[in-house]
């Protein structure tokens, strides 16, 4: 039977509960345990799919097509276990399910209340389908005291009494601020946070204390005394230069040992952290550097590109180099020459996005990369803009554009239900590749034998990658574009959907309709990112 670890946060938001959960999951996994990580989000949205990147950051897409919180990306990257739609739930989803049942009459006329109906639904989600795991780590979004989080805290309070004694522990992540004028760390915010937690019936077993310096013994003693935890359960979570240093740092601080002790489990030797040691050695001692320009629409909110940043880092780890990122707002290139911004970079990456804003700037970035032989990686929207650039400037299709931006005579890119066959509007069925207006989750792609991308993947002819897009490149223009060197080297197995394009004769120019960053791991870098950074190294004359 699975044991449950609930991770809560206090004092301030953005302390890194997701990272702490992922690092602890990696430590338990390194000890031979099977772990599952889940996230409870208290917001009323059904999922983050329609939320602004500036509000929420990245939408992480799972193999089964769920649009989830970016913390699930941390879970996957640290444990290697693919997340599913069953690993993330929101208040909105809980209420939708309850109200659907109420309309059907499932509650037999009962008055629907937060307790017990909402809390029971949360508990059912938490304990569902966990028999195959030794530990289930459950992160509660937000901080203690947030009004929208109260049903979740009540549910995890109840669940300790529902399950056998000793099967549940609580870890509280908190902040120990340093006050320079006083010359000391302050424990009072943590004491008040724990007091708030205890007022709703939850006594933390372990305090995970974010700090920028070592915690003195006297402060540890004070936290243990006033927060009612053992002094050994006050764990120091020092700021780290790299997130991939966190598992080893938490182990050195004794977190995994303390978790096992809280469950009454005897520790059997040291966890196998060799792969983390290798990763951190490469991060700390790179053999060179490359600079990659990310030409995007949401560069003011770096979390909107969280998986992308990490995947570039993984490419650097694979090639033993440090990857520096130049953030460039794509709208800049609509009024200015891109050369001063891009001449010094070793690679250009144009990521996904929605809407017309900044699109022409991304097209200019693709043109610069093509003309100057700079490695170019276009992802989703970035591939579409590269195709439009080729159509306009190589194939002579001056009006080439995307129907996402309005009506156009030359729809190089269109909504996946808009394609014309002859003069007739073609409607796709839900059973086909183009069901609905959003293509979500893992789909296969057939690679052209002998293509660069096939070689990058290890000479395979079929791959599976995750998608999140409404618009697609129009295959009606395929032959005209290929005549000018833009090769369609990957298609859906039925040949309907373009998945990958590449230029023949260019050092490295690849566009993909999918999101490879979602499947990259520090210990298993995605081959496209490893190859892209390798090409950037060649461009910088490092190799």
UniProtKB/Swiss-Prot annotation:
It catalyses: UTP + L-glutamine + ATP + H2O = CTP + L-glutamate + ADP + phosphate + 2 H(+); L-glutamine + H2O = L-glutamate + NH4(+); UTP + NH4(+) + ATP = CTP + ADP + phosphate + 2 H(+). One of its GO terms (molecular function) is identical protein binding. One of its GO terms (biological process) is pyrimidine nucleobase biosynthetic process. It is an enzyme of class 6 (ligase). It comes from the Bacteria. The keyword Ubl conjugation does not apply. Keywords: ATP-binding, Glutamine amidotransferase, Ligase, Magnesium, Metal-binding, Nucleotide-binding, Pyrimidine biosynthesis. The active site is at residues 380, 515, 517. Allosterically activated by GTP, when glutamine is the substrate; GTP has no effect on the reaction when ammonia is the substrate. The allosteric effector GTP functions by stabilizing the protein conformation that binds the tetrahedral intermediate(s) formed during glutamine hydrolysis. Inhibited by the product CTP, via allosteric rather than competitive inhibition. InterPro entries: Class_I_gatase-like, CTP_synthase, CTP_synthase_N, GATASE, GATase1_CTP_Synthase, P-loop_NTPase. CTP binds at residues 13, 146-148, 186-191, 222. One of its GO terms (cellular component) is cytosol. ATP binds at residues 14-19, 71, 238-240. PROSITE patterns: GATASE_TYPE_1. Its EC number is 6.3.4.2. Pathway: Pyrimidine metabolism; CTP biosynthesis via de novo pathway; CTP from UDP: step 2/2. UTP binds at residues 13, 186-191, 222. Catalyzes the ATP-dependent amination of UTP to CTP with either L-glutamine or ammonia as the source of nitrogen. Regulates intracellular CTP levels through interactions with the four ribonucleotide triphosphates. Homotetramer. PANTHER family: CTP SYNTHASE, CTP SYNTHASE-RELATED. CTPSs have evolved a hybrid strategy for distinguishing between UTP and CTP. The overlapping regions of the product feedback inhibitory and substrate sites recognize a common feature in both compounds, the triphosphate moiety. To differentiate isosteric substrate and product pyrimidine rings, an additional pocket far from the expected kinase/ligase catalytic site, specifically recognizes the cytosine and ribose portions of the product inhibitor. This is CTP synthase. It comes from Rhodopseudomonas palustris (strain BisA53).
